[in-house]
Regions:
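Primarily the internal scaffold of c-type cytochrome electron-transfer domains
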Residues: 1-64, 68-196
């Protein structure tokens, strides 16, 4: 089922709320028993959803950045149908240089910030999962349900960034915002299970 009623609903929070309300799960985590969701490569949602990326706000499309201008034999101009990394195509980079003095360097920085944080939070998420798996049989039902919901939410926010494929480059602010939400969930989970964050 499509959870969207418009671009404003294309956010990790709105998607999570939609599936929470439905009680939907993609699978049950084998170690914790948490009802899990799988983010499904949310490139479009990351660029156009919610508050939108800065490039989407300016009217740029996927083709503007990833499909180089080309010319047919008769001189007709069109966008190539070959999807490329924009930093590896001189024709695309030429269009970008008016606003971006060092786009390749900026992308590397965004991606490093995002992947470093993904790895840091993955380790914290893994520790939370292991602790929850160890404690689940000794927790009362309400605490167990809360701990599982935290696992579901933290992993979904993390996964939303992890599987988006741009490593933060499509919308660096949103990537960090979703990783912040993952971290907030984990802090609550660590406190709930008496773990040191």
């Amino acid at each position: 089922t499509n959870p969207y009623t418009g671009l404003e609903g294309m956010t990790a929070e709105a998607i999570l709320a939609y599936y929470d309300e439905m009680g939907f799960k993609d699978w049950e985590h084998t170690e914790t028993g948490a009802p899990m969701l799988k983010a499904q490569h949310p490139e479009f949602e990351t660029i156009y959803g919610g508050a939108q990326s800065s490039m989407a706000k300016q009217g740029y499309t996927c083709a503007d950045c990833h499909m180089a201008p080309a010319k047919a034999e008769d001189g007709t101009e069109y966008s190539s149908h070959n999807l490329v990394n924009p930093t590896e195509d001189p024709a695309i980079m030429e269009k970008c240089e008016g606003c971006h003095a060092d786009l390749p360097g900026q992308i590397v920085q965004w991606q490093k910030e995002t992947t470093d944080r993904e790895h840091e939070l993955a380790a914290k998420l893994d520790a939370y999962i292991k602790t929850l798996a160890e404690q689940k049989d000794s927790l009362d039902e309400a605490t167990l349900e809360q701990a599982r919901q935290i696992h579901r939410h933290a992993q979904f926010y993390w996964d939303y960034v992890m599987v988006e494929n741009s490593e933060g480059a499509h919308n660096p602010g949103l990537a960090q915002e979703n990783l912040d939400k993952c971290e907030d969930e984990l802090k609550a989970g660590y406190a709930l299970l008496n773990m040191t964050y």
